[in-house]
């Protein structure tokens, strides 16, 4: 084996290990090459999307599919190049066409390698020794295996995307399309009756945990950005965290003690936090707005508006929970403020109640 063939074999093994860790081991951040490749493509496409101005959002919605195609192409090129480096020294001797001269350049080697991997057609080149026949056999097995693995991986990615979108739309419908957790809570407790609230919230736990695990299994989901903000992970994550914070701090502690201490409330809080932390840990995010005076003022205005909404719906509240709400919200607000801009959303699109309050203040 020559040095060139050794390098080629190592390159094939490197890409196979990357495919194994990404597709079969399937945990966020475990790939060798794929995480770096997807981040580079994301950064380049996001920078390019800024050239579209107001159409930046729709342009970013194409990033997810483009990254999928680019990653498949990256893997195919890497395997083909590695196999070509192994094949090239054998061209003209143990690997040759049925008739005519045999070019020994790298392009010809890549064409033959692509044929042996079943990626492209490579003419009538054939192996003429036991070792090269075994090489072609191994290459064909690698190509067929990788193709089936990638296809099944794509099915799972898009299945996870569909489930995520379904969860996001469900939560948006429960807010009556407002994106306001106070409206969602008011509709869960019509006339102050919390009888069905626990079961309704419990119905969200299974799809939430499935969405969280889908992002951990299939990191490509991070890069799928829907132009409509209602489908944003940061949007429905914000709504759920705001909802459980309102339940913990604003509802009457005696009348709604069962709801406040219920498992669904605790599960939604923890599950949503885990989902956002997964995105924050494995996706390029930047600092939030924690501790800034204008952010704290906005939180206070937001909770006052939420209390008003709940009172108008006949829900018993206590007004002493404002400081507690602000304190608890500060614990998770910075997380959503990091994730949302990373996906090209503004906090106006995510925190709908605060946006409505600020718009009202400006008109006065």
Give each language-model segment a name.
Residues 39-46, 112-115, 136, 206:
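Short amphipathic alpha-helical coupling elements at transmembrane boundaries
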Residues 164-237, 242-243:
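Non-transmembrane accessory domains of multi-pass membrane transporters/channels
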Residues 18-33, 76-111:
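Outer-pore turret/helix-boundary of cation channels
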Residues 1-5, 62-75:
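Alpha-helical transmembrane segments and their helix-start/interface "positive-inside/aromatic belt" motifs
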Residues 11-18, 68-75, 83, 103-165, ...:
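Pore domain of cation channels
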Residues 50-67, 124:
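Cytosolic juxtamembrane amphipathic/interface segments immediately preceding
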Residues 200-203, 222-225, 229-364:
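Soluble C-terminal extramembrane regulatory/interaction domains of multi-pass membrane proteins
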């Amino acid at each position: 084996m020559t040095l060139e063939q050794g390098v080629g074999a190592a390159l094939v093994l490197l890409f196979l290990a990357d495919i194994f860790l990404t597709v079969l081991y399937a945990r966020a951040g475990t790939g060798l090459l794929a995480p770096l490749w997807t981040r580079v493509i994301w950064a380049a496409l996001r920078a390019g999307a800024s050239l579209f101005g107001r159409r930046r959002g729709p342009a970013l919605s194409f990033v997810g599919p483009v990254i999928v195609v680019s990653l498949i192409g990256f893997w195919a090129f890497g395997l083909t190049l590695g196999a070509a480096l192994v094949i090239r020294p054998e061209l003209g001797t143990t690997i040759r066409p049925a008739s005519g001269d045999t070019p020994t350049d790298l392009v010809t080697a890549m064409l033959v390698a692509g044929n042996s991997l079943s990626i492209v057609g490579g003419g009538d080149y054939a192996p003429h020794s036991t070792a090269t026949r075994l090489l072609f056999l191994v290459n064909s097995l690698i190509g067929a295996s990788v193709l089936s693995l990638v296809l099944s991986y794509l099915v799972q990615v898009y299945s996870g995307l569909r489930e995520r979108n379904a969860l996001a739309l469900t939560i948006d419908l429960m807010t009556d399309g407002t994106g306001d957790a106070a409206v969602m809570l008011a509709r869960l407790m019509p006339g102050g009756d919390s009888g069905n609230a626990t079961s309704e919230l419990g119905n969200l736990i299974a799809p939430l945990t499935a969405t969280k695990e889908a992002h951990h299994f299939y990191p490509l989901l991070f890069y799928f950005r829907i132009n409509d903000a209602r489908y944003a992970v940061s949007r429905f994550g914000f709504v759920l965290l705001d909802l459980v914070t309102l339940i913990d701090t604003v509802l009457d502690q005696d009348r709604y003690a069962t709801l406040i201490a219920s498992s669904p409330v605790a599960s939604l809080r923890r599950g949503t936090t885990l989902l956002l932390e997964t995105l924050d840990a494995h996706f390029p995010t930047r600092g939030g707005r924690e501790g800034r005076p204008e952010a704290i003022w906005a939180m206070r205005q937001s909770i006052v508006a939420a209390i008003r909404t709940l009172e108008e719906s006949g829900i018993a509240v206590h007004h002493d929970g404002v400081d507690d709400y602000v304190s608890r919200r500060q614990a998770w607000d910075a997380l959503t403020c990091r994730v949302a801009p990373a996906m090209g959303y503004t906090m106006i699109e995510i925190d709908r109640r605060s946006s409505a309050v600020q718009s009202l203040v400006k008109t006065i």
